[in-house]
Amino acid sequence: MFSLPSLPSWLPGLPSLEWGSSLLDSLLQGLIGALGVLVLNSLLKVYFFVGCANDPQRRPEKERLRAQWASLETVHLAGLALFLTVVGSRVAALVVLEFSLRAVSTLLSLGKGSQGAAERLQLYLLCQYSLGCGLTCGLSFLQEGAPHRTLNLLLSLGLATLLGLGARRLHRHVCRLYELHSSQRYCGVCLGLLAHAHGLPQLLGRALAIAFAVGDLAAVALINQDFLTTSEAMRFWTPLTICYTLLVIYMQEEQRQHPGLQSQVQTVLVRMGGLFVLLLTVGRWLDLLGILVSLLGELWCLVGVRTLLDLCQIQDFPSQRPPVSTPSQPLPSAPQSQSSAPS
C-alpha cells in the first residue's frame, strides 16, 4: 500500500541535497526556512510602519509601505523556499558562517544613538537569506538520523505556518487600522505597539542571536563531516577564515563610504565571488552551483526589502519613543469666598 515514507523513492534524487534524506525533506526544510524569514520580514514592516505613522513627516514612506501587495509577498515566499531547497547544506553552512562573522564585526563597531540603531536595523534586513540558510542547516543537523524525520519536519512546518500567518495578519492589521485604533484607544494590539514598538528590534535581535547560534553550530558540524583527519580540516578552515576576514574588512569600509541599495548589491556580488573563488580550490563542483543559487537568493531578498533599506538611510529614523498623550484633567477650581451674614 502507498504510504508517505515511500514517496521520496519516486522522486529524482539531487546530488546537491547530500545531507537531506530525500527531496521531500529538503523541500520541507526550505519551506520552514522561508516561513521564518517571513516572520522576521513582517515584524520589521510592522516596526517601520508604526515609526512612520507616529511621525507626520513620514507620510510618503508610510504610503509606500501600505501599498505593497500581498500577492507579491506570496511569490517572494515561494521563490525563497525554492532557493533554500536546492542550495545544498554545504553552501548554506558557508553562507551562515560568513554572515555570522560579518554580523559580529558590525555589532562590535556600532556607535550609539540613532545611527547605531539604523545600522542594526539594516543588519536585520540583510540577514534574511542567511537566516533561512541557518534554519535549514539547523533542521538538517538536528533531524539527522531521526526515525520519524519527515513527520517531525511536517510538525515543524505546521508550527512555522501558524507563526507566519500570525505575523502576516498582524502586519495587515497594523497597515489598515493602526492609526484609527491608536488615536481612539480602541485596540489592545495597536495600543501595545504605540507604547512598546520601540522594543521590537531588541526582541528580534535576541531571537536572531539564538537562531544564528544554533545555525553556526550546525554549520560547523555539517562541514566537518566531510573531513577524515584534522589536517584536511585545517586545509579547509585556514583559507576560509582568511577569506572571510578580508571580506568583512572590505565590506564594512565599502558600506560606510557608499550606503544604499547599490552598495548592498555590490557587497553581495563580492561575498559570493569570494566564496566562489575559495570553493574553486577547496570545494566541489556542485558547491559552485550552490554559490550561484545563493547569489540569486541574496538578490531575491534584497528586492523584497528595498523600501525598508531606503527608510534606514533617512536621518533620525527610527524616531524615539512617541509620547503617549494622557487625558487632560480639569484644574481645581478656586475656592469661593462665602460671606456669612450676621444672624
From Swiss-Prot:
Pfam families: TMEM82 (PF15816)
Membrane topology: Multi-pass membrane protein
Cystine crosslinks: none
Main subcellular location of this protein, as a coarse class: membrane
UniProt feature, compositional bias: Pro residues: 320-333
Region (Disordered): 320-343
Subcellular location: Membrane
Membrane spanning residue stretches: 30-50, 77-97, 121-141, 145-167, 203-223, 233-252, 263-283, 285-305
Gene Ontology CC: membrane
Bias (Low complexity) ranges: 334-343
Keywords recorded for this protein, A-Z: Membrane, Transmembrane, Transmembrane helix
Family: Belongs to the TMEM82 family.
Entry protein name: Transmembrane protein 82
Organism: Homo sapiens
Gene designation per UniProt: TMEM82
